[in-house]
Amino acid sequence: MAHLSLLGLITVGAGGIKSCVNVMGAQQMHPDEHKELITNFFTYFFASINLGAIIGGIVTPILLQQINFTTSFVFILACFVLATVVFVFGDYMNRYVKAKPQGSAVLQICKVVVYSFARCSVEKNKESQEGKFKDDFIEDAKVFFHLLPLLALVIPFNMVCANMTTAFLTQAFKMDRNTFGWTMPAALMRNVDPIAVVVISVLLDRLLYPCLRRHSKMPSVLVRFFIGTLLGALALLCALIVEYVIMAHPLFTVSIWWQVPQFVSIAAGEIFLISTSYEVAFTHAPPELKAVASAVNLCFMAIANSLSAAVFQAASPWLPNFDFEEPEESMVGSHYDYYYYFLIGLSLVGAICCLLMIPFYRRVYAAAIIRQKSGVPPVECR
């Protein structure tokens, strides 16, 4: 029971900080004068998350194996304390641009949804039409609602990402993990993803994006979504090829390093899609709803993880657990290739949806620009 309580605290803490920290970081830049820097910020923001994953994914297991369980958690606690001290010190030095508290925008949005269903109209909730909400807030809410289909496009790709700890891990168990005389833990391959994210982020920010901007070829938001989703499909294709190679050879003979391309492809896709989704939630949402949009973006990622778990469970007849004591027998009836085919198809459907949504995105973007240029001050949420 104590463990469940602690997991609940992690959930509350992560949910509270994740939806706000990226918004606060982006608010340190001027929306017009630093427009290009906002894209750079979200690229490096996502890279910094993965830098933490690298440190945690490598140092923590070593401390756990070489010292003890307590030391591994004390290390993480020390990192949290250091981050908190640095953050508070920055506030003490007046280094932050801080938006004024405006009440619970989440509660207000929920009320708008309920009243809109009750009255079968969003417009009828305006005070000018005898509704309960200020006209400006309803206009902002409409812009926010139009963002939801765009943010939902992250679901197929995040379902692919979830397989790094399921199907990809099982695949690694069946491979030769000998690395210069050391039997590498299969789960350690997961660290290829954050390492690749950090490296590719720097390459994109320093080389590719500046070159594209100079030639006025910087891809739009949904084109980046499209590229990211295609890279997810490419990762699955790489995993499928590796799976067929494993099936064609005796177990434990194919090197685990053949998994690197699929992890690198996912890493590149994460930068194009996930970091861009953070950017969309911030730049396209009205001022008082940016944190709400960020939270909804994270909710869609959580939905993707839940759907991935459900699909994995539904496909369990194809995906038997790998048994090290009876490896050959556990492979009988295994069809991870079918599972990969399904996910590749899902990714391609998601990529096509990204392209089909481009006209809708242009209307949403135009509406967001109009709201931002109208000079309407943030509406206080009561």
What kind of region is each of these model predictions?
Residues M1-R382:
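Hydrophobic transmembrane alpha-helices of multi-pass solute transporters/permeases
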